[in-house]
Amino acid sequence: QKKGFQSTALAQSVLAAAMNIEDLTPILPVVKEIGYKHCALQVLPEHYPIVGENLLAAIQEVVGIDENHPIIQTWAKAYGVIADAFIMVEKEIYEGMAWDGFKPFKVSKIETVTPDIKAFTVTSETQDLSQFTPGQYITVDIESEKLPYKAKRHYSIVDGGKDFLTFGVKRDVNEGHEGEVSTALHDEVHEGDTLYLSAPVGGFKIHHPERPQLFLGSGVGITPLISMYRQVAGDAVSAQMIHVAATETAAAFVPELEHITASGKNNHLHIHLRDREGYLEADELKMYLSDNTEVYVCGGTAFLQSMLKSLQALGVEQERVHFETFVPRLSVPV
């Protein structure tokens, strides 16, 4: 939010609706991706008029016009269309979620994975936690003495079973600014504590499991890919994982990746260390690709843009490339 991603995504959503006002079909996939985030945060239909009222008031203030101006009426119509689309999509998502709202879970284990990544395992005696699709994420609702409000953040599921879920959290430090929630989780949450989570959601998942699978994860972007790699390892024609890290110390979940790789003869793992090998380039990617490989990418914005550009240059069709971002998708220029 402090980096402006949320406001950019909202503006882009309304603009996209205005440009496709007669037929929203072209933007429905993006609407669904955003809808997953909304459902994770428990956004409800009654919240949309509140957002719309404040959005239109902001436009009036910035442009210097009143509420009866044709521009405001036009944007009100565009917002109404996009709000209705979100409400429709989110109704379906809510119906498929494993539980309603935020439920309490016990933190049974905290593991330091790298100097800035921790893995949190939560358990439940009453809730079946196996109902998730590899690639999905949970949402943590947390209170901290250092925060003036309750805060919610999404974290990708690394592993899960009937009575446990494990998710990874990177301490977010960017230009001297520490992420408030990730810092609270790292510094204030201990084994035995309680965390409140909403049910797993997300559309990042395996496509065409009968085809070769290639996973490209940089930094903490490896987290959703681990459960996806685990899902296909041993069964896929080929399952290849490339984990890009700045240094050997920064490489995350390596023992788990090695364990998964050992489960099948068609699995392959490469830990790409930038301090030794430089950036991952198209020439190296080329040897991991076949004519029908499904590719999954997750990492920071620069890594994501670089990989998508390289894959396009290598002739990989857009429909075979799947990616996840840790910021609102419409705020990422890809």
Please place each PLM-identified region on the residue numbering.
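FNR/FR-type flavoprotein reductase catalytic core
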Residues: 7, 51, 180-334
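Catalytic cores of large soluble enzymes that bind and process phosphate-bearing ligands
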Residues: 43, 47, 67, 177, ...
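Short, well-ordered, mixed-charge alpha-helical segments that flank or form enzyme active sites
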Residues: 85-86, 115, 332
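Ferredoxin-reductase
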Residues: 96-194, 244-248, 258, 274-275
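Globin-like tetrapyrrole-binding proteins
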Residues: 1-102
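Surface-exposed helix-capping loop/turn segments at secondary-structure junctions
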Residues: 65, 147, 207-208
